Amino acid sequence: MITHFRFTAGSRNFWHYHPADQTLLVLDGEGFYQEEGGPKRTIRKGDVIVSPPNVKHWNGATPEQDLICITVTESALDGHAVQLRAVTDEEYGQ
């Protein structure tokens, strides 16, 4: 599945995971990516992030800039994504 996303400045998705590999390609802007238990990373145009199956993570735009990206998610019999909980303001602002 290929998906095009635009996160407006300050927005982010929920903690979630995918049953199969997902590749995120940053087309423009600046954002954040974090895997559970790891540091929050700043991502920018040209960055490529691969999320292995079943690894909990979140991503979104920085407070100042939109984030535009494409994701390519491998097929899995049990769905595209499993939504978990909201990313707290504290987690987002770390």
Task: Set out the residue ranges of the language-model regions.
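A short glycine-rich, His/Asp/Glu-containing loop-to-beta-strand
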Residues: 1-15
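Short, conserved beta-strand element in jelly-roll/cupin
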Residues: 6-8, 18-33, 72-74
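Double-stranded beta-helix
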Residues: 58-94
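Short beta-strand His + acidic residue motifs that chelate non-heme Fe in jelly-roll/DSBH
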Residues: 14-15, 33-34, 51, 56-62
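A generic "binding-loop/recognition-motif" signal
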Residues: 11, 19-20, 39, 55, ...
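Conserved hydrophobic/aromatic beta-strand scaffold that supports enzyme active sites
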Residues: 2-6, 23, 48-50
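Short acidic-glycine-tyrosine-enriched beta hairpin
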Residues: 37-54
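Conserved strand-loop elements at the edges of beta-sheets that form or border functional pockets
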Residues: 17, 25, 43-45, 61
